[in-house]
């Protein structure tokens, strides 16, 4: 009984530690496609890691290329 309790506590501790590695808090890269004619006007806002809201991922990619930066998407939706 004591061994089972220790095993369950150990398994629970391992599961809680493996749940969040902190990588998600950094953000994710925008899906950049080679848009020769520019970006669509579809409003699907994303929040950049620079604290600015971009109308969509394409606009964020365009700004990254223009400014030679690598701003990530912190979350979907406005900041």
Curated annotation (Swiss-Prot):
One of its GO terms (biological process) is nitric oxide mediated signal transduction. GO terms for molecular function: endopeptidase inhibitor activity; serine-type endopeptidase inhibitor activity. Its main location: secreted. Keywords: Disease variant, Disulfide bond, Protease inhibitor, Secreted, Serine protease inhibitor, Signal. Gene3D superfamilies: 3.30.60.30. It is found in: Secreted. Pfam families: Kazal_1. The record marks 43-44 as: Necessary for sperm binding. The keyword Secreted applies. It is linked to Pancreatitis, hereditary: A disease characterized by pancreas inflammation, permanent destruction of the pancreatic parenchyma, maldigestion, and severe abdominal pain attacks. This is Serine protease inhibitor Kazal-type 1. It comes from Homo sapiens (Human).
